[in-house]
Regions:
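Short linear sequence motifs
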Residues: 1-2, 168
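Sec-dependent N-terminal signal peptides
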Residues: 3-14
Length: 419
């Protein structure tokens, strides 16, 4: 395998300046995720192999390296119960030596894992999943149309799972968007209200309920969540919706019962949105000039001690004719809520820091702040990873250069990260 690796990466072109000295982790994938073996690579700045893991199935998103050297790998199952862009279904844990420690599949008639996961400090894992809803269930809560021949609507759920044994889980917490809806079309149906008065709720009629095209054919994909991140200090979760051009923050300090309602948790709001940003027209506020996100991916908090700590950073896939990285300062209050003026959208009105250039991807993509203030960026479609300074100087780059291959997102870890 090592000989293969060295040949495979002959096209690597590192550029050195103020580059952060760390270890980069990524999992290249072919579209569809089937056929042959797949690999996760951990490399240094000169693309020397530190470790490689082999997988029988292609990645759904990016892998995660834990401080104990365990690799968490979300992957695409062969026959998903719900199939659209970003379909996953399986989550594996591997030892440093490549032994499979645990493997669990979430792909059934009710739920289908897709895209991202987020390992938690307590050893549990947050998982994004589509939740199957029939047209009748959608109409019963005020949905006006179903936009696919399957006559279904895929809602979204988040599960916190505790790995058990070699292939089982305990579900220790869960959240469902279906518990936080609003509609303004029928006062005789549940959740009736004025959309713009309730930015904490999701308009059931915003956006299309799936389509008859795209990867996998007809689907009920409504919001298309594509990334999830966790902030331990706040005990909050950030998620990204490509189809609605928004990012959201919800409270994780709630019980599962509280997460299904509108009160409880540290912020006192239950499972309602604490914050949302990118497209305030989705909740009846603002105008087209406030619509700042377009098909974004990869939202995450900048860690404590890093330049910009506590801010959110994300990959905005469509910005003018390219893609861009946004860093935003959220209007966080001391009590864990987020400030918003009556009738106005959530701030900020613009990013604190924005990096763009000659890169553009329609699929996935991501950005992470590094300890020295640099940012590592992944152009998914071009299978390219690069590092830029705060002043927009590109100091390191890598082009996978392997044809019909993409890299969802890459992360870079400190050299002393592993315990």
């Amino acid at each position: 395998m090592k000989i293969f690796f060295l040949i495979y990466f002959v096209l690597t072109i590192p550029v050195f300046g103020q580059v952060f000295n760390g270890m980069t982790l990524f999992s290249p994938a072919q579209g569809g995720g089937g056929g042959g073996n797949f690999y996760s690579y951990l490399v240094d700045n000169e693309m020397n192999e530190i470790n490689t893991w082999t997988h029988p199935r292609g990645p759904a998103s990016m892998p995660y390296l834990l401080p104990d050297s365990t690799l968490v790998y979300p992957y695409r199952v062969p026959t998903p119960s719900m199939n659209a862009g970003g379909t996953g279904g399986g989550i594996s844990k591997y030892s440093w030596d490549g032994d499979l420690l645990w493997d669990h599949v979430i792909s059934n008639s009710n739920y289908q894992h897709h895209h991202d996961v987020e390992p938690l400090p307590n050893g549990n894992i947050l998982v994004i999943a589509w939740e199957m809803k029939t047209a009748e269930e959608a109409y019963a809560v005020g949905r006006q149309s179903i936009d696919n021949s399957l006559n279904v609507m895929w809602a979204e759920a988040i599960f916190e799972i505790e790995p058990v044994g070699s292939d089982d889980v305990n579900i220790v917490w869960e959240w469902h968007i279906w518990d936080h809806l609003i509609q303004d079309v029928d006062p005789d149906l549940p959740n009736y209200g004025v959309i713009s008065d309730h930015p904490e709720l999701q308009d059931i009629n915003y956006g299309s309920a799936g389509s008859n095209g795209g990867p996998g054919g007809a689907n009920g994909d409504w919001k298309h969540l594509n990334a999830i991140a966790y902030n331990e200090e706040l005990d909050q979760i950030a998620i990204s919706s490509r189809h609605h051009d928004e990012i959201y923050i919800i409270d994780h300090s709630t019980t599962t019962e509280e997460a299904a309602g509108h009160v409880g948790g540290n912020a006192g709001k239950g499972g309602d949105y604490l914050y949302r940003w990118g497209n305030p027209q989705a909740y009846g506020r603002g105008n087209t000039s406030d619509h700042l996100l377009d098909d974004q991916h990869g939202v995450n908090w900048i860690p404590e001690g890093y330049p910009g700590e506590g801010n959110l950073i994300l990959f905005n896939n469509n910005y003018t004719n390219n893609s861009a990285v946004f860093e935003i300062v959220t209007p966080l209050n001391d009590d864990g809520t987020y400030a918003i003026s009556e009738g106005q959208p959530y701030g900020p009105g613009e990013p604190l820091w924005l990096h763009t250039g000659n890169f553009h991807t329609q699929m996935q993509g991501g950005a992470f702040r590094l300890p020295n203030g640099n940012t590592i960026v992944t152009d998914c479609d071009d299978a390219t990873i690069f590092e830029v300074t705060h002043d927009h100087e590109e100091v390191w780059s890598y082009d996978h250069g392997a044809g019909q291959v993409f890299i969802a997102r890459a992360q870079k870890y400190e050299l002393n990260y592993l315990g």
